[in-house]
Amino acid sequence: MLLGAFYDLGVPKKVIEQPLIDLGLKDLYQLDFKESKSCSIRGIKTKVENIDCSPIKRTWKSIKELILNGHLEDKLKTIIYGVFESLAIAEGKVHGIKSDDVHFHEIGAIDSLVDIIGVCAALNYLNPKRVYCNEPTLGKGFVQTEHGKLSVPAPAVIELVRQKNIKFLSDWNSIEGELSTPTGIALLANLVDYLEPPSKYSINSYGVGIGLSLIHI
């Protein structure tokens, strides 16, 4: 959703894909942005098709080497590294293993690599002075993962909000489902300056991203 919103805001597709090309990932996916509607509201839906036939599951160690050895500008490299490192530390903590040994089942998949790297590239391109975000709602219920059925918020989300001291909305009457993923919280932790809206602001432009899930309120 966030990547689609950035594209809708005007970030060129070339900007989003360039760091993926620089990291040697271009032949592993097909990225498309499509005008769509959800509840009659228009926006952009992002589709990442995985054409990576490799059975190898990436670890944080291999992703770290890919980022550090990649031909990226220093600022962007630091941002991308920070997001993945946060995820690795959190996943390592909840699974009781070293962060380097974490197998990224969900975020190691090529679609998640495209999503994380693309979002970081888009924000780097926009170069805002400050980034604001409302406190996240984590959700409730259960979610199906590579490790089986887990309660919501997922253990990695709990560890990330603890690790990064992220304040969140504790509404026990919140909508059923996973409203904040580990990837989303890691992006928030590394890209957002303030977890509250500014007291006064005006809107010059905005983007709308449409997700894959329909939440029933």
Describe each model-derived feature in a short phrase.
Residues 23, 37, 108-110, 135-144, ...:
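Acidic, glycine-rich active-site loops and adjacent beta-strand->loop/helix elements
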Residues 46, 111, 188:
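Divalent metal-coordination and catalytic microenvironments
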Residues 99-106, 132-135, 170, 203-205:
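General beta-strand structural signal in soluble alpha/beta enzymes
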Residues 112-119, 131-167:
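Active-site histidine-anchored catalytic micro-motif
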Residues 215-217:
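Conserved small/polar residues in nucleotide/adenosyl-binding loops
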